[in-house]
């Protein structure tokens, strides 16, 4: 991943500058170029978009539940079957793939970002500290919202004896990241 290599190169250049070495501006610019075109902003916009979509999905789930219970006496019905199909088709298959890509990219980039940020700690401004805090809270809060939403979907379908992916994986349970994994 070119962004990780760029962050590592930039970290090394910061160390060199702190040690008093002279660097060519063009070398620093070359290190920044992959970041300018790369993943960093896309990751943050991905987490923000996911957070907004999850909040919207929570709102729809609230509205869906307020109208009437999905099932009575844990008995499935056509409405519950349609809901389970929707959850399985949209969330457990397509949306979950996108979430996994976002999570993997974040896990690749953030260690290099952390290394770079630690190397800049002595010259860190309050604005940068606030940005880092806000960024980390966005990611952490969105992860927590995802786990909560998946649990709610499971609980809602559980009132009918169903779960997302139930027909494919009868013992699927949500994992710590909010994805359903077969057991």
Language-model-detected regions and their locations in the chain:
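Acidic/His-rich structured neighborhood in mature extracellular/periplasmic domains
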Residues: 1-54
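A cross-kingdom marker for long, charged
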Residues: 38-183
């Amino acid at each position: 991943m070119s962004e990780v290599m760029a962050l590592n190169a930039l970290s090394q250049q910061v160390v060199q500058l702190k040690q008093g070495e002279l660097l060519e501006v063009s070398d620093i610019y070359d290190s920044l170029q992959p970041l300018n075109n790369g993943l960093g902003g896309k990751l943050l916009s991905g987490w923000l978009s996911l957070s907004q979509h999850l909040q919207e999905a929570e709102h729809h789930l609230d509205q869906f539940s307020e109208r009437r219970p999905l099932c009575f006496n844990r008995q499935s019905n056509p409405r519950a079957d349609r809901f389970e199909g929707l959850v399985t088709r949209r969330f457990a298959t397509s949306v979950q793939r996108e979430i996994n890509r976002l999570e993997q990219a974040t896990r690749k980039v953030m260690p290099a970002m952390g290394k770079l940020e630690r190397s800049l700690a002595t010259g860190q401004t309050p604005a940068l500290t606030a940005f880092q805090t806000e960024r980390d809270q966005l990611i952490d809060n969105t992860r927590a919202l995802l786990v909560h939403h998946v649990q709610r979907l499971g609980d809602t379908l559980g009132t009918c004896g169903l779960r997302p992916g139930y027909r494919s994986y009868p013992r699927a349970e949500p994992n710590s990241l909010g994805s359903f994994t077969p057991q």
